[in-house]
Amino acid sequence: MYSDKVFDHFQNPRNVGKIEDADGVGTVGNPVCGDLMTIYIKVKDNRIEDIKFQTFGCAAAIATSSMATEMAKGKTIEEALKITRDAVAEALGGLPKQKMHCSNLAADALRRAIVDYFRKNGKIDKIKELGLEKELEKMEKGEMDDHGEYCEA
């Protein structure tokens, strides 16, 4: 059963859309259940000034995307990187076990958007400093994250 917050973010998602001139874009997906999320960020003075998402998936996928963008908006890049999968689920009042992969995808899409921002701005040293090299490697190979262990679709 979903919490009232999940229903609210599903029925009234915040920050839906695309930023055409995004400073960073992160896309992740789960081939098991078909969820696909893209998060776009606009950064000014090391702070996420604007953030949007496009998600194709279930109610939990849309709600977690909405919540992750709400949590990240206005935060510094470093603060946004601290937004965890569990924090997204907790902010929504919890998720059923079989939907936890959605919070994983939302947090990972945000992290990928930040890695993309660093890459586009020649800050590869920052990616290494923050231990995000594996994320960059997956992005460069075009790999999607698979959180199938959480998905019972």
Curated annotation (Swiss-Prot):
Q: Name one GO biological process term.
A: iron-sulfur cluster assembly
Is the Iron-sulfur keyword given for this protein? yes
Its keywords, alphabetically, are: 2Fe-2S, Iron, Iron-sulfur, Metal-binding
Domain of life, source organism: Archaea
- Keyword Iron in the entry? The reply is yes
Q: Which family does it belong to?
A: Belongs to the NifU family.
Q: Which NCBIfam families match?
A: NifU_clost
User: Which proteins does it associate with, and in what oligomeric form?
Assistant: Forms a heterotetramer with IscS2.
* Entry function: A scaffold on which IscS assembles Fe-S clusters. Subsequently gives the nascent cluster to other proteins. Binds 1 2Fe-2S cluster per subunit in a crystal formed under reducing conditions; this subunit provides 3 ligands while IscS2 provides the other ligand. It is likely that Fe-S cluster coordination is flexible as the role of this complex is to build and then hand off Fe-S clusters.
Protein name per the record: Iron-sulfur cluster assembly scaffold protein IscU 2
User: Which organism is the protein's source?
Assistant: Archaeoglobus fulgidus (strain ATCC 49558 / DSM 4304 / JCM 9628 / NBRC 100126 / VC-16)
